[in-house]
Amino acid sequence: MSFSPLIRQLIDAFRVLPGVGQKTAQRMALQLLERDRSGGSRLALALGQAMDGVGHCRSCRTLTEEELCPQCADPRRDDTLLCVVEGPTDVYAVEQTGYRGRYFVLKGHLSPLDGLGPEAIGIPQLMERISQQGTFTEVILATNPTVEGEATAHYIAQLLHEKGLVASRIAHGVPLGGELDLVDGGTLAHSFAGRKPIAL
């Protein structure tokens, strides 16, 4: 079926979302145009406001509308623990466990084949944050339990070891090859309780 230029543009816009293919994008676009124009208007408004108003926390780099996210602005958090995650969705997953320390959000994981080295994902900024803060006694590496996540954790652990800092890895109650934001809170809490130092 051939769509008009504006409908094609809307379909292509939906396809930028993860997991949305051609057919799903068509269904979404046609649903909004045929049956829910007010929903489409709300979506456009919310998307525009979020794109303009949401940035990154200057401390941990998660998504927020403020200079500091709620976790970084909270003075009751434990300043001796730093949890390193791959992305903002992982912060929300870890929060479900009752973790009360600080965070640092990488921009993904090391992936040399995709051209993502330490600088691209923010490892120099992580090391700078650790040096500047000076209060962390343990850095919890909560990268995803994938090959790339494990490589990223090992790389960071080596850097921390050179500075005499303790690095721990969340236990593997999280399924291998899984994503943190898809794991239930109980499993993730168990993984945190069973974390162990990384042997180098």
From Swiss-Prot:
CDD domains: TOPRIM_recR. Keywords: DNA damage, DNA recombination, DNA repair, Metal-binding, Zinc, Zinc-finger. A zinc finger (C4-type) spans 57-72. The keyword DNA repair applies. Residues 80-175 form the Toprim domain. GO terms for molecular function: DNA binding; zinc ion binding. One of its GO terms (biological process) is DNA repair. May play a role in DNA repair. It seems to be involved in an RecBC-independent recombinational process of DNA repair. It may act with RecF and RecO. Belongs to the RecR family. This is Recombination protein RecR. It comes from Pseudomonas savastanoi pv. phaseolicola (strain 1448A / Race 6).
